[in-house]
Amino acid sequence: MLDIKITRTTCPKEKPQDESKLGFGKKFTDHMFVMDYTEGEGWHDARIVPYAPFQLDPATVVFHYAQEIFEGMKAYRTADDTIQLFRPECNAKRMQDSADRLCIPKIPVEDYIQAVEALVDVERDWVPHSDGASLYIRPFVFANDVGLGVHASKHYIFCIICAPSGAYYAEGINPVRIYVEDEYIRAAPGLTGFTKCGGNYAASIKAGELAEEQGYAQVLWLDGVEKKYVEEVGSMNIMFKIDGKVYTAATVGTVLPGVTRRSCIELLKDWGYEVVEGKLAIADIMQAARDGTSMSLVSLFITANGTPMTFPKSFKQVFNFMRVYVPTEQTWLTP
């Protein structure tokens, strides 16, 4: 168990007055969680301190070789003023998988959750009250060695920051236009597609800009080998319902294992849907649409944003679990 030292700010920021204009990740709370790693000592000096910049040497490893990982999750305020987290252990375990791939020391699941809960408790007044808004939580780890040699760092910083946020897209949970990218790729077998690391996202910016220029909100990525099988959208997983079956790409190294994706699959199976995790060619999807086959799709944003589908029960139920709108037997919420 972490011994977290808390130093509260003496200059609190003004909180947003109009929650309908929050945007995403634009304004940050008063505090942040920080913990250091030193080879031979492990993770140490867990603390919550006033939000402030880091002072880093220009030769810090992360600037040059991108040895860093991150997560994304949310805290929700319920009708009875309780603050809830949605399946934080899934984010903690996924960060461990990312850490293993990037040669970063793992953070124990219980320590990750304790750190998140402690920071959210300090910042509970920043959790929005309105529907569709939440406190976005961004845990991240970066290499902190100084030097230009290419090797795993011996020092790291684990930090968590928070931002009261609205919908990721301006469209909210209304349908968005998605561009199918058949030139650039997001991931390939053996690389880091299943992790949350900055390099994956930096490499996606070019295609995202080209899509935006043509009026699209996001990019649908195809596989990196044959460029014909659907994998995921830039900020979300995606599913297709065709003739009663639900299809989605398997998370076998090139697709990020989304928490909302996992939750919807579990619910769909409980409700009797056949869920197929495997290869689905974009040509087959387009042909099904042309043939008038019974088909719909849902984009599963990790924060539960997405497009409506003809099996709305799954998406809405997951979102309702997050907001505690409906009772559930699922142990997915952490007060």
Predicted feature locations:
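Conserved catalytic-core subdomain
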Residues: M1-D18, K27, G166, A170, ...
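N-terminal accessory segments that position/regulate proteins before the catalytic core
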Residues: M1-K93, S98, V176, M295-P335
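Extended Lys/Arg-rich, glycine-bearing segments that form polyanion-binding/interaction patches
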Residues: D18-K21, P88-Q214, V298-Q317, Y325
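Short beta-strand scaffold segments in enzyme catalytic cores
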Residues: F33-D36, M73, C159, V219-L220, ...
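Flexible, glycine/charged-enriched surface loops at secondary-structure junctions
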Residues: V109-E110, W126-S134, V219-L222, G272-I282
